[in-house]
Amino acid sequence: MPRRRVAAKREVLADPKYGSQILAKFMNHVMESGKKAVAERIVYGALDKVKERGKADPLETFEKALDAIAPLVEVKSRRVGGATYQVPVEVRPSRRNALAMRWLVDFARKRGEKSMALRLAGELLDAAEGKGAAVKKREDVHRMAEANKAFSHYRF
């Protein structure tokens, strides 16, 4: 346990176009090497593509996609008497969002479309419909937790 005080959580400023804190945080996940303007261009470009493809509100689609990706439970390794058990634990809301954003960006980067904006738009639309690689990752994590339910009494 740390001896110092716990660092205060900094508030993220809402993004200028949509006024959403979650979107601003997502831009920080997309950003590489401190290039925020590039990250903004990618995210706004992706949301414009989502709007083009007939979805009414791109921000609503984005939030729906995040909900579809965010895991409810995950497994943590716990060592008990020489054996390591995968113990299912509930995921904190802040970690849920962080994992969802991380998975969304990671799997968007692995897609085959030309630009990152197109890849991100494709992954967002897939996730909002309950399919795509990021949603599959969530299902895998849930399946792992379900398989190790027997060890849930080894709480943290």
Curated annotation (Swiss-Prot):
Q: Which Gene3D superfamilies does its entry note?
A: Ribosomal protein S7 domain (1.10.455.10)
Q: Which SUPFAM superfamilies match?
A: Ribosomal protein S7 (SSF47973)
A GO molecular function held by the record: structural constituent of ribosome
Question: Does this UniProt record's set of keywords contain Protease?
Answer: no
Disulfide-linked positions: none
One GO biological process term? ribosomal small subunit assembly
Could you name the Gene Ontology cellular component terms for this entry?
A: cytosolic small ribosomal subunit; ribosome
One Pfam family from the record? Ribosomal_S7
What does the UniProt keyword field contain? Ribonucleoprotein, Ribosomal protein, RNA-binding, rRNA-binding, tRNA-binding
Does the UniProt entry include the keyword Lyase? no
Its function?
One of the primary rRNA binding proteins, it binds directly to 16S rRNA where it nucleates assembly of the head domain of the 30S subunit. Is located at the subunit interface close to the decoding center, probably blocks exit of the E-site tRNA.
Recorded family membership: Belongs to the universal ribosomal protein uS7 family.
Task: Read off the NCBIfam families from this record.
Answer: rpsG_bact
Q: How does it assemble?
A: Part of the 30S ribosomal subunit. Contacts proteins S9 and S11.
Task: List the HAMAP family hit by this protein, alphabetically.
Answer: Ribosomal_uS7_B
**By what name is this protein known?**
Small ribosomal subunit protein uS7
Record organism:
Pseudomonas aeruginosa (strain ATCC 15692 / DSM 22644 / CIP 104116 / JCM 14847 / LMG 12228 / 1C / PRS 101 / PAO1)
Its taxonomic placement starts with:
Bacteria, Pseudomonadati, Pseudomonadota, Gammaproteobacteria, Pseudomonadales
